[in-house]
């Protein structure tokens, strides 16, 4: 039922593309996310996706299922902002000068917030889960690994869309587009390098801490 409600909200928003439908869509997906949280918690013992044995952090990131739903929520929010980019640009032109600068600053800050969110949650996923993310360990990859890659793939797309919206608010709008092939290739290279370094470094530190823990435990048992 939540999925049908989401499809209905998105269809309504896509059909209208107004600030009213934009607001209704954001309120709607927020309500759906809040409703999904207790439902997910009630399945902690029955569904591995929501089990703390697979992944657990604090608050709204208490399970992998909640993490993936949070990521989906962020992606849908950004997608809605991108769909409204022309209306947003038009609104900016109609604002007084003072408000125009504030409006632009908010849109420029959004990619920064998104970047911090991606980095922090990705770091949390590596440090607080038993999910294999290293591509070279292909035989150990499972459905949860794939779900994580798809989820963060959507977040990296969302980050790119936010950069494009922020660019539209500057004097470079019309001359540069991050969606052109050469910029996309550079972006893909940067994201690939980031994920590779993050997974390798944090995975190594995690394994090092685990080995140190076992070493300490063995030394205590010998004593």
For every predicted segment, state its role.
Residues 117-120, 191-223:
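Juxtamembrane extracytoplasmic/periplasmic/luminal helical "stalk" adjacent to the first N-terminal
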Residues 1-177:
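Juxtamembrane segments at transmembrane-helix boundaries
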Residues 175-191:
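N-terminal signal-anchor/signal peptide hydrophobic helix marking the start
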């Amino acid at each position: 039922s939540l999925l049908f409600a989401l499809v209905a909200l998105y269809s309504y928003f896509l059909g209208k593309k107004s600030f009213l439908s934009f607001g209704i869509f954001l309120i709607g997906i927020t309500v759906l996310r809040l409703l999904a949280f207790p439902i997910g918690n009630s399945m902690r013992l029955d569904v591995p996706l929501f089990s703390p044995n697979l992944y657990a952090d604090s608050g709204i990131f208490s399970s992998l299922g909640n993490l993936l739903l949070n990521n989906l929520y962020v992606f849908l929010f950004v997608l809605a902002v991108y769909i409204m980019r022309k209306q947003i640009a038009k609104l900016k032109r109609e604002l007084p000068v003072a408000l125009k600068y504030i409006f632009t600053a908010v849109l420029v800050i959004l990619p920064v917030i998104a970047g911090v969110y991606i980095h922090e949650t990705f770091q949390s996923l590596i440090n607080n889960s038993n999910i294999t993310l290293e591509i070279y360990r292909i035989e150990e990859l499972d459905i949860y690994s794939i779900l994580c890659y798809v989820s963060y793939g959507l977040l990296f797309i969302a980050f790119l869309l936010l950069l494009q919206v922020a660019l539209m608010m500057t004097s470079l709008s019309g001359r540069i587009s991050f969606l052109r092939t050469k910029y996309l290739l550079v972006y893909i290279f940067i994201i690939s390098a980031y994920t590779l370094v993050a997974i390798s470094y944090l995975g190594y530190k995690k394994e090092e801490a685990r080995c140190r823990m076992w070493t300490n435990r063995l030394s205590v048992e010998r004593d």
